[in-house]
């Protein structure tokens, strides 16, 4: 009975890794579309987000099956319940990437200013998602703590983007709408960082039983 349960837990881990990889891919695609000012590339984000949505449903079904058909001990119960929380944040990451892609399509090929900082935010969030899922699979609370600390990098980059764009609006009011679009993109990246942080916090809960909120 336990061996069957362990097999299903291993399947859960694989599914979580695959969903995490899809999140990394969707962030990278949105970032590339932004950097290259490519609306056609941005259109490919939607189908990836749909894959993430489907993966969330698959994992949710697996978790419920584990809870109903097996008798998980406290540690296993925390791991399963943490996975259910984490996939909600991963699904939201896909949604935020699609929000970014929609703005890129609206910009219709206009290149993004401050793309150095926006690219930095994208790379940081990809790294955070990778590490948070790795921390879950490896039950590594130190790695999860690292992810939580890395959110400061994303927050600081967002603050700098906001400062630059406010300066731009002040100097060139005619570019106000464009600047606000870029600010929204930065905000979506900042939210992705928050979701990755949430994932890391649930990793810590799954191992320790304590839900640490940053």
Regions found by a protein language model. Give the residues of each.
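Cytosolic, long alpha-helical scaffolding segments
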Residues: 1-214
């Amino acid at each position: 009975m336990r061996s069957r349960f362990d097999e299903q837990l291993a399947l859960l881990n694989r599914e979580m890794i695959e969903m995490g990889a899809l999140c990394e891919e969707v962030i990278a695609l949105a970032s590339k579309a932004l950097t290259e000012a490519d609306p056609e590339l941005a259109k490919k984000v939607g189908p990836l987000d749909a894959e993430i949505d489907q993966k969330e449903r698959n994992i949710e079904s697996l978790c419920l099956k584990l809870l109903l058909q097996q008798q998980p001990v406290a540690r296993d119960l925390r791991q399963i319940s943490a996975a259910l929380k984490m996939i909600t944040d991963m699904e939201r990451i896909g949604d935020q990437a699609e929000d970014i892609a929609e703005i890129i399509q609206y910009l219709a090929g206009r290149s993004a200013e401050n793309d150095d900082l926006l690219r930095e935010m994208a790379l940081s969030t990809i790294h955070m998602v990778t590490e948070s899922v790795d921390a879950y699979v490896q039950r590594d609370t130190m790695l999860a703590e690292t992810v939580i600390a890395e959110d400061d990098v994303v927050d600081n980059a967002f603050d700098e983007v906001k400062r630059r764009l406010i300066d731009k609006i002040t100097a060139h009011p005619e570019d106000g709408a464009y600047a606000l679009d870029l600010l929204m993109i930065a905000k979506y990246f900042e939210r992705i960082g928050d979701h990755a942080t949430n994932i890391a916090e649930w990793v810590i809960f799954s191992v320790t039983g304590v839900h640490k909120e940053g």
